[in-house]
C-alpha cells in the first residue's frame, strides 16, 4: 500500500524558501503568544476536555451553528479518518475525484473500503457525475493541489446525486470567494471539514473540525479517539478565534500576493489554473517537465511540491509566501524560462 508522503521538511536554519506545504507565511495572532506565555506547565499533567466544548461553542458562534453540529479533531486529517471510520465499513464505497488530496485514497485503503475514483481534467469546469450508491464522497473545495473552486450551487447539485454522506473538504475556504457552509443548513447529507492550519497560521497546533447535521456529528463522536485535541491546542485555537482582525488582514495579504504573482507569472509565459487557495499550480510552457521544473527550483533553494500523478506531471504546487519571497521566486522563473520554453 502506498502511504501519504508529506512535502520535504528542511532542517532548522537551512536557507530555503519553503513553499511546499501551504503554510501561512505570517505568524499566528498575538493572542496565541499571550496564551503560550500564560500557560502553566503543571496543567499539562491533566487530560484535555475530551469533546473540546469551548472550541465548538466558539466556532459555532463564529460560523452560525450549534456546538452539537461541530466536532473537533487532531487536524483535518483526523476528521477525515473519523468520517471514513464512521460511515464506510469494509467493502463499502468511498468516492473522490483525482487530482485531489492523496490522503483520501490512503484512508480508503487503510479501512478496507472500495475507492471509487473519478477523474477530472482541465479546465475543471464540468463537475463529475456522483454515483448514487456511495457511502461517502470527498470533494475538496478549493481543490488541492490544483486550486480551482466550485460555487455553492454547483456543489449542491453534486451532493444531491448521492444517497451517501457528501463531504466538502474546505481546508482552504478562507482564501476563496465562496464556501459551502450554507449547504449544511439546506441538505441533510452534507458535512463540511475545515482546519485552522492555513488560515490561522496554526499548522503546528493540529486542529481540524467538521460541521454537519447533529445526527451525523453524534455518530462521529462515537468513533473518535477519547482525547484527540490537546489542552494546549484547545487554548491557542480559542485565542486565535477571538482575533478575526488578524485573520482578515493576513487573508487579504495572501490573496493580493496570489493575484499579483499569478499575473506576473502568466505574463512570462507560465501556465496557471485560476486558484482560490493559498497556493497555485504553476506550469512551465513546456509540458511534461514538472519534475525537472521542481528540481530546478530546488537547486535554487525554492521548495515546491511535485506530484507524480496523472494530470499533475506538467507542473508544481507552489504556496503563496510573503511578497518578498514571491519576488525572489519570480526572478528565478525569469532565469528558468529559456530552459522550459516550448519546443
Regions found by a protein language model. Give the residues of each.
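PLP-dependent aminotransferase class I/II
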Residues: 51, 189-266, 270-273
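Conserved PLP-binding catalytic core of the aspartate aminotransferase-like
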Residues: 255, 267-300, 316
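PLP-dependent aminotransferase-like
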Residues: 86-140
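A short linear hydrophobic-aromatic micro-motif
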Residues: 68, 192, 268-271, 302-307
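Active-site phosphate-binding strand-loop segment of PLP-dependent enzymes
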Residues: 116-174
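N-terminal "arm"/small-domain region of PLP-dependent enzymes with the aminotransferase-like
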Residues: 1-46, 132-133
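PLP-dependent enzyme catalytic core of the Aspartate aminotransferase-like
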Residues: 153, 296-300, 305, 309-343
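Phosphate-binding glycine-rich loop
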Residues: 53-93, 111
